[in-house]
């Protein structure tokens, strides 16, 4: 078991004791259990219930949203963390936070906001996660109205940071993937105190691969139920070869490795049973058996491979690495390819994405025109504190990113109606 230190438990703002207890009571929870509770009770996490995973949150009778996906990632991350001797609450908290920075419409919304935000430092869902946890989520403020967000511990913010680097490097080069906006560099510097490199801590690594497992396994399950995904492709060698080519281009690896992964999956009785899904009670039981066994297959393999690669047996923060065996990575990549590409290649899905981006641009123009008064009340203080046009633009981006999809659509409709009225 890794020994976390007082530095790992430190928070950016020293909080006073809670004054409202009826009787004296010593809180037995550790700092990471408190971090987990803060994330679990946050508005930012609840808003994920109305944000797109692969298909929209209102599609189907059993919708999988960013929130349900995050709960699944948290459970898987807790399992990997427990197997490696990490703090289970810390790993679960990292899973809960991993998508908390996603804007309306998921990656499609992220692309639209990145285009809009070019003059104020860009937009990246992972960087927005750090910004929410350390500033935007209303929990802790000082006497000067400086917000510390949820005021999580150093280790918790580190565990939530998949890419612990700013957008711009010291030499001026720009990272495509980053976990911190340049303007928030002082926060990342505090989080990474004592860790000079830009590699993710082991808890964040566990969270990251848990995301891949949940994404691939559970989204395949959704696709099968909706009729968008058919596992029969694993036995159609012509279509499989084409799918492997697409998957390698989109997610990495080689087509040959993905075809080999299909060979391994075909050998599993649970895959054959799920391929015959017909919507019956037995069909759903077989499908749930597939998801359960695949998750266990991948979690167990990762734990054993990680242990084998670390003779000391100690994991935590910068000690140890999460190791993903090649076969596991290939199987997960193939399943992710099946889950995503069949949906993404649907013409109606692409048309829907075009409309989503149009709404985001419309809401942005509406907030720019309306200024302070058009913003949600919580964001007006940051607007007043802004010292440049770029900082005011960042406030607008923060406001849009915080919206649920339903809310964004209502604001877009109001904007369209106002434009029509104004002629």
Curated annotation (Swiss-Prot):
Gene Ontology terms describing biological process: dGTP catabolic process
Entry keyword annotation includes Secreted: no
Claim: Zinc is one of the keywords in the record: no
Residue ranges annotated for the HD domain, each copy included: 66-216
GO MF term (any one): dGTPase activity
UniProt xrefs under Pfam families: HD (PF01966), HD_assoc (PF13286)
Annotated PROSITE patterns: HD
Alphabetical UniProt keywords: Hydrolase
Gene3D superfamilies from the UniProt entry: Hypothetical protein af1432 (1.10.3210.10)
Entry-linked SUPFAM superfamilies: HD-domain/PDEase-like
Domain of life: Bacteria
InterPro entries: dGTPase, dGTPase-like, dNTPase_2, HD/PDEase_dom, HD_domain, PHydrolase_assoc_dom
CDD domains: HDc
PANTHER family, A to Z: DEOXYGUANOSINETRIPHOSPHATE TRIPHOSPHOHYDROLASE, DEOXYNUCLEOSIDE TRIPHOSPHATE TRIPHOSPHOHYDROLASE
HAMAP family cross-referenced by the UniProt entry: dGTPase_type2
Membership in a protein family: Belongs to the dGTPase family. Type 2 subfamily.
Name listed for the protein in its UniProt record: Deoxyguanosinetriphosphate triphosphohydrolase-like protein
Species annotation: Corynebacterium diphtheriae (strain ATCC 700971 / NCTC 13129 / Biotype gravis)
């Amino acid at each position: 078991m890794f020994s976390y230190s007082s530095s790992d438990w430190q928070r950016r703002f020293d909080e006073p004791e809670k004054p409202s207890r009826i009787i004296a009571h010593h809180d037995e929870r550790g700092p990471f259990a408190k971090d987990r509770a803060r994330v679990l009770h946050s508005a930012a996490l609840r808003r994920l219930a109305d944000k797109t995973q692969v298909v929209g949150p209102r599609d189907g009778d059993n919708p999988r949203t960013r929130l349900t996906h995050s709960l699944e990632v948290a459970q898987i991350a807790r399992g990997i963390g427990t197997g490696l001797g990490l703090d289970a609450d810390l790993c679960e908290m990292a899973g809960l936070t991993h998508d908390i920075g996603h804007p309306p419409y998921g990656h499609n919304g992220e692309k639209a906001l990145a285009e809009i935000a070019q003059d104020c430092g860009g937009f990246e869902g992972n960087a927005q996660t750090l910004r929410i946890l350390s500033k935007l989520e209303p929990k802790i403020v000082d006497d000067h109205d400086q917000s510390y967000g949820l005021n999580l511990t150093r280790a918790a913010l580190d565990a939530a940071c998949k890419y612990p680097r700013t957008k711009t490097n010291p030499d001026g080069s720009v990272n495509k993937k980053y976990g911190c906006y340049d303007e928030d560099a002082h926060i990342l510097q505090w989080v990474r105190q004592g860790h000079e490199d830009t590699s993710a801590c082991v808890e964040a690594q566990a969270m990251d691969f848990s995301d891949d497992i949940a994404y691939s396994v559970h989204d395949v399950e959704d696709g099968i139920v909706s009729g968008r995904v058919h596992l029969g492709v694993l036995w159609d060698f012509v279509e499989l070869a084409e799918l492997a080519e697409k998957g390698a281009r989109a997610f990495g690896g080689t087509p040959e490795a993905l075809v080999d992964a299909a060979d391994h999956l075909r050998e599993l009785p649970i895959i054959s049973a799920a391929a015959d899904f017909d919507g019956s009670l037995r069909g759903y039981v077989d499908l749930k058996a597939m998801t359960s066994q695949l998750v266990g297959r991948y979690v167990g393999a990762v734990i054993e491979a990680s242990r084998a690669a670390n003779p000391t047996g100690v994991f935590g923060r910068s000690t140890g690495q999460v190791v993903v065996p090649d076969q596991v990575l290939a199987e997960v990549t193939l399943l992710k390819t099946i889950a995503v590409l069949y949906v993404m290649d649907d013409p109606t899905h692409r048309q829907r994405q075009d409309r989503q981006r149009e709404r985001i641009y419309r809401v942005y123009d509406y907030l720019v025109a309306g200024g302070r008064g058009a913003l949600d009340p919580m964001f007006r203080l940051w607007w007043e504190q802004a010292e440049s046009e770029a900082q005011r633009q960042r406030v607008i981006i923060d406001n849009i990113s915080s919206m649920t999809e339903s809310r964004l659509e209502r604001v877009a409709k109001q904007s369209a109606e106002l434009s029509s009225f104004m002629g």
